[in-house]
Regions:
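Aromatic-Pro/Gly-enriched surface loop or interdomain linker
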Residues: 658-740, 771-773, 880, 898-915
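Long beta-sheet-rich domains in secretory-pathway and surface-associated proteins
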Residues: 417-686, 691-693
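Active-site beta-strand->loop->alpha-helix modules in alpha/beta enzyme cores, enriched
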Residues: 25-198, 219-220
Length: 916
């Protein structure tokens, strides 16, 4: 049976990340980057309180950062965010990451967020399968019992006093939000029931009953200009105003911190202007703070309690731990807690009177008192659960006191390696660095974990005031070290992740095994500080120094492109395709290896192998193979036997060892480097597909998508258009000009020279516009008046009705049938065209079954005749379907491309627009 890590260990691991320095950002001030006296005073706020608030949401960016910052920084409470999904079903406005890679990016963005609001981050196993209009659909895809169990587990681990959910009711879209809140409400009671999810109890978790559950009731207050405050009218409602008060230690309001935190959700377009005092205070629309309604409580008075604050009725003081002992607590418990509280008060007074170093003595006394009380608990005659609850919180206080003591002593600790990408068996030079900026000597020594061996001089020694010590150690990475990558992968039968069983539940990522433990003695008390071993890099011009954990990578990292190859079922010489394989040498010296493709039966790769030679570490080589299908008759027979989708794999062989693993790097200036493991595979899709020959497409890249590669697979030549080409290039040489995802938001040159595209269409060209959001509505970029809406169709299996069956999009050169609308992924499309001039013609209509999105939906595929040419808007999500290998999407795109160079027919009769 798998055992969970003790709750106290998870708490220590969560706090350990605070010792990893963060990079600077323009005009932003991460609270985690605070040092010296401000950091000390912030830490002192945590020592005499045990307040604990958990927030639950559906996706990254749903959280109220002001509330987390207020309770975490201003009040000193423990704050945690449990996010149901990692947001992998959303869009990406800064790069090409989708699906699993987007999950990694958005998880890292939350880590960047918490450098401001200070919360711990946890997740359930739920997958963001895309926008949903149905709680029932969400529960069915997630698995109600599985995700409910995840919430129960996190409540039992974190043991919050107050839980804050997101929206509970509402008939709008995004029903993941309502689902997560309803599951949280059920978990609020279930976590206290030992009969609920008994397997968790068997692994060592204890039941826990939180005291209050709130949910978001809207924005703006009763007179606010934002969304009206909502609720059932039968429970108490208050507006959270804690974010509006100025915190002199932070130098900002918590609302201002929240604005900085929220700007880290950059892939969701939230890198907006920061709030200014009196201009845009609070989370959400201007006009007021967020409202919360009490949904459930175990406190007297029930949900009608006239509370003005979330923690009204909850004793959050450290001294209040005596309540676990019942009506007559042991005198030793009361006295022990009193000594700890007094030591904290003495430390605050010392800092105020004489500065940081003056707090060392009181803090050492406080740490000693915590440890003494821990040791005495067993002899106090406490009930088992009382002892458990008190001891758990005292263990957390030990960690907090140790870290605060280091701050008071003005000791800085670092652990850095000379290589950030390592392979099994590699020696690494690690430096454990300590600087004593205080006015008293400290004793310290260091050790490394996660390595096979570590040699060097880091024995315990005295570090004098104003001195520094650099312990240089040689460590060996284990030969069979696990490759560094996300510990979650998609389940095949549900919208859930499967987690590696050795990773503690809920963690954002697997914790690095490479850790330095620094043992200090400060003021006569021992402190043990965990410092993850990091590598340093210069980043780019804007990010400066960046740090990341050490990544274990394959000796030879292998990748293959393109990821998808489209082969016409007719076969023949034109069906041969090029496959490129890139090999990166991560060994520390020269190396030679052979590269080959593993092909399905009857397929041939030419040449059979390529030899690659490397002279140094991090050198790369790319080789090309020609992939040829079997003869046409054999290819047709293979397809009939179900072989329309095949896999070609790249392998590297050296000395009898085979390497067949690569990775995708996910990193931006505001995030830490992460790897997503990728098998070097090419999916070969054999399709009954034709496309007009010799097509050249001018592509205006937007936020980053994989559509150009898909166009190349269809046989078109895709050229990325530069600003100069948009401004004065010869556009007439393109049969089609296509704008990428969100191009009108990303490309100022496209907005500036949009008239050139309309003139191109008027002269007989075909313009295809992939989906945009509301930035498209800032001017008339289409040939006639029309706007983008938030309308979407989320059911990937929704009913399809072709409105103009004779249109070449559905007939030429490929006949689009019902089969082409099957096996779509996640959705039909989003941000459909709306409020359109009658000159626009809808070509297709979707209908999905969900009550909150019923009725036919137009605007997914819209065409307008412009002069002798065409202008098309694609709300239909081909940009998502093409990288996913959806067959029908390729056939439909082939027809859209084949419109190029053909005159637009007279506009058909307008479609009734009642479905909009």
């Amino acid at each position: 049976m798998r055992r969970l890590l003790p709750v106290s260990v998870l708490f220590v691991l969560a706090l350990a990340t605070s010792f990893v320095p963060t990079h600077a950002q323009n005009r932003l001030q991460p609270v985690s980057a605070m040092t010296g006296r401000p950091a000390l005073e912030l830490a002192l706020r945590t020592l005499d309180t045990v307040g604990n608030v958990m927030m639950t949401t559906a996706h990254p960016d749903d959280e109220n950062n002001a509330l987390l910052a207020y309770y975490g920084h201003t009040k000193g409470f423990r704050t945690s965010l449990v996010t149901a999904t990692r947001g992998e079903g959303g869009q990406n406005e800064i790069g090409p990451e989708l699906f699993e890679a987007l999950a990694v990016l958005r998880t890292e963005e939350l880590a960047a967020v918490h450098k401001f609001d200070g919360a711990e981050q946890y997740f359930t196993r739920a997958v963001d399968f895309g926008y949903s209009f149905s709680v029932e659909e969400t529960l069915a895809k997630w698995g109600k019992q599985e995700i409910l169990g995840d919430y129960v587990r996190m409540i039992r681990i974190i043991r919050p006093d107050v839980i804050v959910g997101f929206v509970f009711d509402g008939e709008g879209g995004g029903q993941h939000h309502q689902t997560s809140s309803r599951l949280t409400a059920e978990a609020f009671r279930a976590a206290a029931d030992p009969a609920a999810f008994p397997d968790q109890i068997k692994t060592g978790l204890k039941p826990w009953q939180p005291k209050k559950f709130y949910y978001t009731a809207g924005f703006g207050g009763p007179q606010g200009r934002g969304q009206a405050l909502q609720g059932d009218g039968a429970s108490s409602l208050f507006s959270f105003t804690g974010g509006e008060s100025y915190d002199p230690l932070l130098g900002r309001t918590c609302n201002e911190i929240a604005g900085e935190a929220r700007s880290m959700h950059k892939c969701q377009g939230m890198s907006q202007l920061l709030p200014l005092p009196g201009v845009s205070e609070g989370f959400g629309p201007p006009g007021g703070p967020r409202g919360y309604r009490l949904r459930d409580t175990v406190l007297p008075g029930g949900v009608n309690r006239p509370d003005a604050e979330m923690f009204d009725g909850v004793d959050t003081s450290l001294a209040g731990l005596v309540a676990y002992a019942g009506a007559s607590p042991p005198a030793g418990l009361t006295a022990g807690l009193s000594r700890i509280v007094s030591a904290v008060a003495d430390a605050r007074a010392a800092v105020a009177a004489r500065g940081s170093n003056a707090a060392v003595g009181p803090l050492a006394n406080g740490l000693k008192a915590v440890r003494a009380l821990q040791g005495d608990l067993g002899g106090m005659g406490l009930a088992e659960m009382a002892k458990y609850e008190i001891d758990l919180r005292l263990a957390q206080k030990v960690t907090q006191f140790e870290q605060t003591l280091v701050l008071a002593a003005d000791v800085r600790l670092d652990a850095v390696a000379n290589d950030g990408l390592v392979v099994g068996g590699q020696p690494v030079q690690v430096q454990i660095i300590a600087a004593n900026r205080g006015d008293a000597s400290v004793s310290l020594g260091g050790s490394l974990s996660g390595f096979t061996s570590a040699t060097g001089d880091c024995v315990t020694a005295t570090l004098a005031p104003k001195g520094a010590r650099n312990c240089k150690m040689t460590a060996i990475v284990p030969v069979n070290a696990r490759l560094t990558a996300a510990h979650f992968k998609y389940a095949t039968d549900a919208a859930r992740f499967i987690l590696d069983p050795d990773v503690p539940p809920g963690l954002p990522f697997r914790l690095t095994p490479f850790v330095a433990t620094v043992a200090l003695t400060i003021g006569g008390e021992a402190a043990s500080i965990l410092v993850p071993v990091a590598s340093r890099s210069e980043g780019n011009l804007y990010s400066g120094e960046k740090r990341a954990e050490m990544h274990v990578v394959p000796k030879f990292a292998v990748s293959a492109t393109p990821e998808i190859v489209i082969v016409p079922a007719s076969g023949g010489p034109r069906a041969a395709r090029d496959v490129r394989v890139t090999v990166v040498n991560h060994s520390t010296g020269a190396a030679t290896a052979d590269v080959a493709l593993q092909t399905p039966q009857g397929w041939r790769a030419t040449p059979a192998t390529h030899a690659v030679t490397f002279s140094r570490e991090d050198e790369a080589a790319t080789v090309k193979f020609t992939l040829s299908p079997p003869a046409p008759a054999a290819l047709v027979a293979q397809v009939k036997l179900g072989g329309s989708r095949l896999t070609v794999s790249a392998v590297v062989r050296e000395g009898g060892v085979t390497y067949a693993q690569g990775y995708q790097v996910v990193e931006y200036p505001h995030t830490t480097r992460r790897h997503v493991l990728r098998a070097p595979e090419v999916m070969v899709s054999v399709l009954d597909l034709k496309v007009k020959p010799n097509l050249t497409v001018g592509y205006v890249m937007g936020v980053g998508d994989d559509v150009p590669q898909a166009l190349e697979q269809l046989g078109a030549r895709a050229e990325l258009l530069s600003e100069d080409q948009l401004a004065f290039g010869d556009l007439s040489r393109y049969e089609v000009i296509m704008t990428g995802v969100r191009a009108y938001e990303r490309r100022a040159d496209l907005r500036a020279y949009n008239q050139r595209l309309l003139d191109y269409a008027r002269a007989g060209g075909t313009v295809v516009v992939n989906y945009n959001k509301f930035e498209f509505n800032e001017a008339q970029y289409g040939p006639y008046p029309g706007k983008v809406s938030s309308r979407r169709v989320t059911d990937e299996n929704s009913t399809v009705r072709v409105l103009v069956p004779q249109h070449p999009v559905f007939t030429t050169p490929n006949k689009i049938t019902e089969a082409d609308w099957r096996e779509w992924r996640q959705e039909r499309g989003t941000y459909f065209f709306d409020k359109a001039d009658p000159q626009y013609t809808d070509l297709v209509e979707f209908t999905e079954p969900f009550p909150y999105n019923q009725g036919p939906k137009l605007g997914a595929l819209v065409e307008a005749k412009v002069g002798s040419g065409r202008w098309l808007y694609l709300g239909i999500g081909l940009w998502r379907q093409l990288p996913a290998g959806t067959d029908g999407a390729y056939r439909l795109m082939a027809n859209i491309l084949s419109l190029g160079g053909t005159a637009a027919p007279a506009r058909p009769a307008p479609t009734p627009r009642g479905g909009r």
